[in-house]
Amino acid sequence: MKIVINAASAKMGGAVTYITNVLRCLPGPESEYEFEVFLPPETASEQVGLARNVHLLVTNIGHASWWKRLWWEQITLRSHLRKTAAALLYSTGNFGMFRCPVREVLLVCNALYFSKVYREGFVPRHNWRMRVAFRLRRWLVRRSAESCDVVMTPTQALLDDLRPAVKVDLHKALVNPYGVAEEGFSPQPVEGATPAPGEGCGPVVRLVYVSLYAEHKNLATLLEAIRLLNRDGGRKFLLKTTVNPAWKDAAWTTTYRDDLALAGQPGVAPWVEFVGPFDRAEALRLYRGADIFVFPSLVESFGHPLAEAMAAGLPIAAADTPVNREVCGSAAEYFEPFSPEDLASKVTRLASDRALRQRLGLAGSRRAAAAPGWDAHVRRVLEAAKLGAAS
């Protein structure tokens, strides 16, 4: 059974994390499957140790203009499916093929298109070209979801946001949580003077926030909270984050200038270090060097960093959103998303209460260990390929 996986737009961030883990878990040549995977060159070069029946097809179409990508996905890829006698198309990047000639499973994984917070709070601040492009992409996702055989989301929260905008029958909708990459992320044992993550908060508390910069990542709320946390002469809070408004790909956002200015203010700059973007090994060191993980992001489809922080045994302070609660459950303290005061209060509580930190860290470790792994995620994709969305 030949399965074509379209991940041609998986260039960075969660898209790369996703496809990398999926490819590593695809069944080998002893199975009935053969896989052809479209990937951009920079992502393809990072894939090692794949099964012999996984064939990478490198393409630069993910870097092309939207209309060229649309032509490729609707015309060029359609021709490839017919010529290669593929049995299934797995579209991993929100956009699918209209009237696909074979069975299609579509992963909707960009929550921005269906987030009321993003549509009302950020889209109107963009120029007319960006607003038109957003509406067009949202329409394409809706049309793709209506056209495919199975619609898959990583969280129930995203499916709940999708349903008011798209007519998705119950029999074709599937919530398939992402796995948790546990290798190397398990909590470190206490040895000598080396504390496990979340323990030993003393005069300096180490905070970490891992993600790529975007306007919905809500960096301003965190920076304002850092100012509040460090305004007296007591305990100091140091933030290390990869959410960098000076990142080369941040210029499209409407918030990066304000965030850069805020980060440079005297009450903020001494306590914030921008780092990365990081590869997996560097990110692991970042988690291990932290006391508390903070996650103010307003919109997520799943939140890979939350899963990684739980696997690392870190106590978490997260924005109170449906998806964050779905992923973390009782393993986090939640704050009002736009309230620096509430965020600062929750972080102060965590820093002052060792028992609470340990309880949240243990709850996160157990939750990550009990969560379905990437093998289970891939298995459900393959089941959907043959049986539909019945779970």
Ranges and model annotations:
Residues V4, E199-K217, L223-I226, K240:
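Conserved donor-binding/catalytic core segment of Leloir-type glycosyltransferases
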Residues R52-H55, V243-P245, T253-A281:
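Nucleotide-activated donor-binding/catalytic signature segment of Leloir-type glycosyltransferases, i.e.
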Residues L81, R285-A290:
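Short alpha-helical donor nucleotide-sugar binding micro-motif in glycosyltransferases
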Residues M130-V151:
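Membrane-proximal helix-turn-helix segments that form the acceptor-binding/catalytic region
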Residues A157, G179:
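Carbohydrate-associated surface elements
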Residues L298:
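Aromatic "clamp/platform" in nucleotide-sugar-dependent glycosyltransferases that forms part
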Residues L306, A311, P315-A318:
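Short hydrophobic beta-strand element within catalytic cores of glycosyltransferases
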Residues E333-P340, R349-R354:
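Conserved acidic donor-binding segment of nucleotide-sugar-dependent glycosyltransferases
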